[in-house]
């Protein structure tokens, strides 16, 4: 089996490859010229479906996996939410987005507050489109700690831990992450449709 990932995000692709060991995982950009996919949905699920469908239309008959994920901070009105990848503006780096969120907390004198990650996975297959979700709850802090992971990991402390995802061992992160939970369900779906 081969899975085409509808992303160019190296961090996401690396995480997906680790999860689906023994299955060929290819970013779509290795098969077709990369292009910008307009994510104009109002939820993580909407955007994951848009990405999966868009790549599937270019590579019909394949299995396309798309992820849309982000972090939501309720005390800030749920931001960055679906705008997590572009919170600091179009073309912003992970680091830019991270420090923008830290600045938003500091502006309000918030040292630590509840937040959660959401991951929506869409699978576009010859049998239709399937979706799964995963969540990870915890707190964000007003500083970056650790250099593991990517995105907002250095400021997010998962529930039950005292270290940020940027400080935790990658195997621990893999076992508790929102994306891992959604990918686990996606893996079950894939096995059921491939039998």
From Swiss-Prot:
It is an enzyme of class 3 (hydrolase). Its cofactor is Mg(2+). One of its GO terms (cellular component) is cytosol. The keyword Magnesium applies. Pfam families: Ham1p_like. Binds 1 Mg(2+) ion per subunit. Mg(2+) binds at residues 38, 68. CDD domains: HAM1. Substrate binds at residues 7-12, 69, 150-153, 173, 178-179. One of its GO terms (molecular function) is nucleotide binding. It catalyses: XTP + H2O = XMP + diphosphate + H(+); dITP + H2O = dIMP + diphosphate + H(+); ITP + H2O = IMP + diphosphate + H(+). One of its GO terms (biological process) is nucleotide metabolic process. Keywords: Hydrolase, Magnesium, Metal-binding, Nucleotide metabolism, Nucleotide-binding. The active site is at residue 68. Its EC number is 3.6.1.66. Homodimer. Pyrophosphatase that catalyzes the hydrolysis of nucleoside triphosphates to their monophosphate derivatives, with a high preference for the non-canonical purine nucleotides XTP (xanthosine triphosphate), dITP (deoxyinosine triphosphate) and ITP. Seems to function as a house-cleaning enzyme that removes non-canonical purine nucleotides from the nucleotide pool, thus preventing their incorporation into DNA/RNA and avoiding chromosomal lesions. PANTHER family: INOSINE TRIPHOSPHATE PYROPHOSPHATASE (PTHR11067:SF9), INOSINE TRIPHOSPHATE PYROPHOSPHATASE/HAM1 PROTEIN (PTHR11067). Belongs to the HAM1 NTPase family. This is dITP/XTP pyrophosphatase. It comes from Nautilia profundicola (strain ATCC BAA-1463 / DSM 18972 / AmH). The lineage of its organism: Bacteria, Pseudomonadati, Campylobacterota, Epsilonproteobacteria, Nautiliales.
